[in-house]
Amino acid sequence: MSAYIIETLIKILILVAVFSALGGFATYIERKVLAYFQRRLGPCYVGPFGLLQVAADGIKLFTKEDIIPQGANKFIFTLAPIIAMVSAFVSMAPIPFFPNFTLFGYEIKPLISDINIGFLFFLAVGAAGIYAPILAGLASNNKYSLIGSARATIQLLSFEVVSTLTILAPLMVVGSLSLVEINHYQSGGFLDWLVFKQPLAFVLFLIASYAELNRTPFDLLEHEAEIVAGYCTEYSGLKWGMFFLAEYAHLFAFSFVISIVFFGGFNAWGFIPGGIAILIKAGFFVFLSMWVRATYPHVRPDQLMDMCWKIMLPLALLNIVLTGIIILI
């Protein structure tokens, strides 16, 4: 077995382990953030400052009985959470999380695969995760799950179109689909960040990302007040945990991608080293998603579709046209 294969396997194991752990810890942070906004304490009883609440929740979750409803398609019911997990972690393959570094005289690239269509790969594999809620709802033999599945179809597919068109303008400026090249393009300093050259693209992509991640105010797929838990209604134990981990893995992936594409990535930020800089940026966008959840109410499905097709899509197309004209001039 070649050194490259061994290195890649080690990277995959580290990536899955780290982001699975971060997904669990993010629930603690989110509960604390929401509690602060609502003037509550949040988790505080299990361990110091409630830090062991994550472990307690994990033990409770993974020791629950795994129930498959009567009349459900067992194969597809089991396959759906696997698709969610696989798409979430595979989409991280082209993301450069840190600058290259040397370990025991060997240069380490902190990404799994530096492909020249990295951004396209990220969007395409992430979009494959759409099949998870669709299949889960169809296979569950539950009306609430089916409604969540229908909402997944219209919401995720619609915003996949918007996010893809939105990102075309920044890619036209850079001239590359590689996330590594996009990061290098902004290496000149603070003023080279694409957020200053493509502010509209940043805002549109951020909103579309929240819709694709099923985050509030766009969590129509599992809106508790309307459809119980949506496509997850019949899931319990390990399978439900896989959906939950996939959602947070997607959140971290999008936070890193937004940091790389619009905010200079892992380039040094003044006196702050690049590795620490990208952690600060990605952490901010994770916190921002929690802030939005605590602040904004849910939107109706018709409002969401109107915003997608009547506002965001025309703005994304207009941004592409204006960017093309500026480049030609």
From Swiss-Prot:
Enzyme's top EC category: translocase
Keyword tags: Cell inner membrane, Cell membrane, Membrane, NAD, Quinone, Translocase, Transmembrane, Transmembrane helix, Ubiquinone
Membrane topology term: Multi-pass membrane protein
InterPro entries, A to Z: NADH_UbQ_OxRdtase_su1/FPO, NADH_UbQ_OxRdtase_su1_CS
Gene Ontology BP terms: aerobic respiration
EC number: 7.1.1.-
Family: Belongs to the complex I subunit 1 family.
Record protein name field: NADH-quinone oxidoreductase subunit H
Organism annotation: Helicobacter pylori (strain P12)
Organism lineage string: Bacteria, Pseudomonadati, Campylobacterota, Epsilonproteobacteria, Campylobacterales
